[in-house]
Regions:
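EAL-family c-di-GMP phosphodiesterase catalytic domain
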Residues: 6, 22-26, 36-39, 92-97, ...
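C-di-GMP signaling machinery
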Residues: 1-13, 53-59, 95-102, 106, ...
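Catalytic core of bacterial c-di-GMP phosphodiesterases, primarily the EAL and HD-GYP domains
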Residues: 26-28, 58-139
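A short, well-structured catalytic beta-strand-centered motif of the EAL phosphodiesterase domain
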Residues: 15-51, 70
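Structural preference for long, well-ordered alpha-helical segments in enzyme cores
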Residues: 32, 52-53, 66-74, 108-109, ...
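Conserved long alpha-helical elements within nucleotide-processing catalytic cores of c-di-GMP signaling
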Residues: 47-51, 60, 141, 145
Length: 252
């Protein structure tokens, strides 16, 4: 299997996409995105190995690999004196499952960051609604609350695309809401999508949550999000996902 071979041969790697404070334009962190390097040197995205995430044990192994790589990169930047903000990682439903002989997700994240001498502020956790709907996950709400209590920021990813986003927003514990890029990309040409983005931002403010807009690609979208009071953004307008070696991480 492609994913198993990638884990065995160390072919999985992380690319990093910057996250920006929309009011100042300052970079506040990165999202780590999984990629696979093929023998010919080309790099492919997760759609090529998405089937691996349907297998709980394999998916958990991949998630643990992503955590280790993100923590190692955060430590490298911190050691070099780079003010990188944070690295956000996506967590799958399989990672919430307790397996014999393996630490629970909370202990795994805490252990990895502490061993690297990092603060919880250096690593963020992003969870999609698909994880909430999955029957594979364990006591997700309790684990998310434990992460927040320990000082980690938890984000509700791809908000607005699921079947029960509002229900899960009420039932689970989050610090940030990430607006799905499909709404952001359509908002300047569609009054309906603009209204949806505005409603999400207003709701988040009322709940005391921060908002991240995904998929920001144009200056018009940036201006519209600023006018609505969106806190943060990420997308091709600010930078494409790229390897750590190709990133410009020194102060502007």
């Amino acid at each position: 299997m492609l994913a198993e071979e990638a884990l065995l041969h160390g072919s999985f790697l992380l690319h990093y996409q910057p996250k920006i404070a929309l009011d100042t334009g300052r970079r506040i962190g990165f999202e780590a995105l999984l990629r696979l390097k093929k023998p010919d040197g080309s790099v492919i995205g997760p759609t090529a190995f998405s089937a691996a995430f349907d297998e709980p044990i394999l998916s958990r192994r991949i998630g643990s690999h992503v955590l280790r790589c993100a923590v190692a990169q955060a430590k490298a930047w911190a050691t070099a004196g780079v003010d990188f903000g944070h690295i956000a990682i996506n967590v799958s439903s399989s990672q919430f499952i307790g397996l014999p002989g393996s630490p629970c997700l909370v202990d795994e994240i805490l252990g990895a960051t502490r061993s690297a001498g990092l603060s919880p502020r250096h690593i963020q956790v992003e969870v999609t609604e698909g994880v909430m709907l999955s029957e594979q996950g364990g006591d997700i709400g309790t684990q998310l609350e434990a992460l927040r209590t320990a000082g980690f920021i938890v984000a509700f990813d791809d908000f607005g695309t699921g079947f029960a986003s509002l229900v899960h927003l009420k039932e689970f514990s989050y610090d940030q809401i990430k607006i799905d890029g499909s709404f952001v990309r359509a908002m300047t040409g569609s009054s309906a999508d603009h209204a949806i983005v505005k409603a999400i931002i207003d709701m988040a403010k009322a709940l005391g949550k921060q908002v991240v807009a995904e998929g920001v690609e144009t200056v018009a979208e940036l201006h519209a999000l600023r006018e609505l009071g969106c806190n943060y953004g990420q997308g091709f307008l600010f930078g494409r996902p790229t390897s750590a070696s190709d990133l410009r991480v020194l102060p502007d």
